[in-house]
Amino acid sequence: FVLRIEDIDRERAGSAQRQLEDLEAIGVDWDGEPLIQTARADAHEEALASLAARGLIFECYCTRRDIREAASAPHVPPGHYPGTCLTLSESERAAKRASLAALGREPALRLAAPSPEWTVFDELHGSYTGPVDHFVVRRADGVPAYNLAAVVDDAYQGVDQVVRGFDLLSQAPAQAQLAHLLGAPEPTYAHVPLALAPSGARLAKRDGAVTLADLRGLGWSTAD
């Protein structure tokens, strides 16, 4: 059992320690030292360089508002990037890059996905084919995007089966296609049902959900 601390989202400071405490509280142990995702920056950059060398990356100059407005077009799947910056000319790219630089900003990097869809195998749902858009692989702040970091680190750790919540099933085709492009094995998946409130929404504190830390505070032990 290997453990990875996915800490590239700096806004979730302190969550890693809480996760370790939760695992210890239910008696789960792991082999070796946890892999710290932010310590793998060199490997993530190597993956980006490999994609760039094959023309599989392009700069994106869009704001969230730009994407939201363009994504409302009827031919764009809900939540997907509409490809605004994919086919810009070099002169257009230079102008947009200069405009961002004047604002002290950098462009994000997106995958020029070769296939608009990909099929994965899920242990619970069988063969699943989903759309793959030109998703972000490096954010505008220079931090590798989660999808890229997770795929690179899964390959490094030898992860061949991914078990997670059903709400992430739609992400599997994009991650599997990226693994294929990086020459990494594509894992199989098992997307399990979520714990839902009576309304059908995800269970939250307001619905009476409790954390393992809450239970520890109430005196529950590992055996409980």
Task: Please give the residue ranges for each predicted region.
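N-terminal Rossmann-like or analogous alpha/beta NTP/dinucleotide-binding catalytic cores
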Residues: 1-76, 155, 166-184, 217
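Active-site cores that bind ATP or allylic diphosphates and position pyrophosphate for catalysis
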Residues: 65-204, 211-216
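A conserved active-site cap/scaffold subdomain adjacent to cofactor or substrate pockets
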Residues: 219-221
